[in-house]
UniProtKB/Swiss-Prot annotation:
Protein name as it appears in the record: Phosphate import ATP-binding protein PstB
Species, as recorded: Edwardsiella tarda
Keywords recorded for this protein, A-Z: ATP-binding, Cell inner membrane, Cell membrane, Membrane, Nucleotide-binding, Phosphate transport, Translocase, Transport
Family: Belongs to the ABC transporter superfamily. Phosphate importer (TC 3.A.1.7) family.
Subcellular location per the Swiss-Prot or TrEMBL entry: Cell inner membrane
Length: 259
């Protein structure tokens, strides 16, 4: 693997010798990398390479499934989240996630945003109103929803629903936002809106995105990790990785020779 180029003094997440298993299947093999604070890091690679698996270790989603296990260290602000003592609810408040398909809750737009906040904070109605407006504004959705906050989240278009999910994710004020192929089900215009939003979000959050779309990774991210068959092949500054990859496998993938 090529050298990790992020600034270790500014790392939000540090992955050290991470191995991950689905039962007996060895899905991630000795992964080590640093995720820099207030930057966008993209994971790319062919289907089945382990990029979504790696993403989901950052908030321990795998704990929902007894046959899945992780070994090694994932340090969030220097604390290893893989220990049994880690409070998973608090971890997921710090590390939010947006999935591939928009997943609005079956409730109003307002309550979609307020739902998670109520789990962690007791706000007055006025403060909650302010938080809902803040989150929708951050997600570039306020102007489109301010007059219909009490309509169902399902009444929104697909692109709007995904921005609603992003707003819901940031409403609890996490420190890290994980995006698992957030644009794969969206049209080009909605995709463009999400990409603009990702660029803006890094001012306040550390963003990690999994994408099949190499052009999207090139447009949105500061750093890119290329994975293949559970291994981290190359991790570099995005511009460098796409213009002068250090590894032949990386070059073959980004030029379409395989994957």
């Amino acid at each position: 693997m090529s050298n990790v180029v992020t600034d270790p003094t500014n790392s939000k997440i540090q992955v050290r010798d991470l191995n991950f298993y689905y039962g007996k299947f060895h899905a991630l093999k000795n992964i080590s990398l640093d995720i820099e604070k207030n930057k966008v890091t993209a994971f790319i690679g062919p289907s089945g390479c382990g990029k979504s698996t790696l993403l989901r270790t950052f908030n321990k989603m795998f704990q929902l499934y007894p046959e899945q296990r992780a070994e090694g260290e994932i340090l969030l602000d220097g604390q290893n989240i893989l220990t049994d003592s880690q409070d998973v609810a608090l971890l997921r408040a710090k590390v939010g996630m947006v999935f591939q398909k928009p997943t609005p809750f079956p409730m109003s737009i307002y309550d979609n945003i307020a739902f998670g906040v109520r789990l962690f904070e007791k706000l007055s109605r006025a403060d909650m109103d302010e938080r809902v407006q803040w989150a929708l504004t951050k997600a570039a959705l306020w102007s489109e929803t301010k007059d219909k906050l009490h309509q169902s989240g399902y009444s929104l278009s697909g692109g709007q629903q995904q921005r609603l999910c992003i707003a819901r994710g940031i409403a609890i004020r996490p420190e890290v936002l994980l995006l698992d192929e957030p644009c794969s089900a969206l049209d080009p215009i909605s995709t463009s809106r999400i990409e603009e939003l990702i660029t803006e979000l890094k001012q306040d959050y550390t963003v990690v995105i999994v994408t099949h779309n190499m052009q999207q990774a090139a447009r949105c991210s500061d750093y890119t990790a290329f994975m293949y068959l559970g291994e981290l092949i190359e991790f570099s500054d995005t511009d460098k990785l796409f213009t002068a990859p250090a590894q032949r496998q990386t070059e073959d993938y980004i030029t379409g020779r395989y994957g």
